[in-house]
Amino acid sequence: MTSAELHTTAIRINTHQYDDLHKFKQYRLFPNASVQYNFIKGVNFAVNYNKKISLPSISLLNPNNNTYGNGNFGISGNANLQPTIFDNIEAKISAFDYVFLGYNLSLVNNQIIQKMIRRGDEVSVINENISSVKIHNFNIGFPIPFMIFTKSIKEIMGSMSTINPDKVSFLYFFANYQLQRLSEIKPNGLWFLNLNAQIVLPKGIKLNANYSYIPAKVGYFYFQTDEPLNNTLDITLSRKFMSDRLNVSLYVNDVFNTNKMSSRSVYQTPNVLIRDKSDTRTFGISVNYKIPTRNKLAKENPNMLGSDKKEDEGGLIK
């Protein structure tokens, strides 16, 4: 399966710092090619190549947009940022949309990254393009259905293609390891770990628990974490009513109030240390109602794996 896209992009930026309009124009072909081999029904190996463009956000471009500032610290935009071009190569083996093992290589031109600069007692965060970056991603995901305690492996494998994950109790494990290679520095690899549990209780009640964790001493471009990052446990109790059209949920986000940021900038020596902690524990109730439709093709996708990969803009500080 192959496809190609032709994009033309023109952006004009007008600020009080420039007498003339600063503009850039891109006219490129963005191909997309995929090859898939099916071993058996539901099990396949796929290779994909695609070229993408990512435009800098307005907040990054606008030099007047000071997201935060005081006498000692400030963040501002950069009107000279250029669009980022990604050449992505991915290989992945997957089974029944739930189990997968994958590798992705991104060759990036004009990656937007954050640099923290210290001049005396004044610290500023700037956004710049760097000419080239290689980003390696290794990821794995698999479920552990609780039915393994009551059914044989043969029975479970035979029902994988027809199983509805909304009706099954399971523990899902996901891990991603990212390695960034820049010309100036070689950051430590970045681990992202996630556990998601779903337990189907009596009376149609579901308990969902989601735990995510990024360990300390991992690298993210010109930053290194000193303490675990994104360390959160979220719990949700939900039940559907009215033929599944009405969904009522009670939730607690960051149950132990452990989410915080503690990192250092390695762009300059001595390093600038950053630490931020606020009360991130939240409680709430959510009520959702799905309006009935006569479109017989409209239905929820039971696939628990996200398929869209978003390109980030290289910064810990937003």
Set out the residue ranges of the language-model regions.
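Conserved C-terminal beta-signal and adjacent last beta-strands/turns
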Residues: 187-318
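Outer-membrane beta-barrel signature, preferentially recognizing the C-terminal barrel domain
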Residues: 53-109, 125-146, 278-279
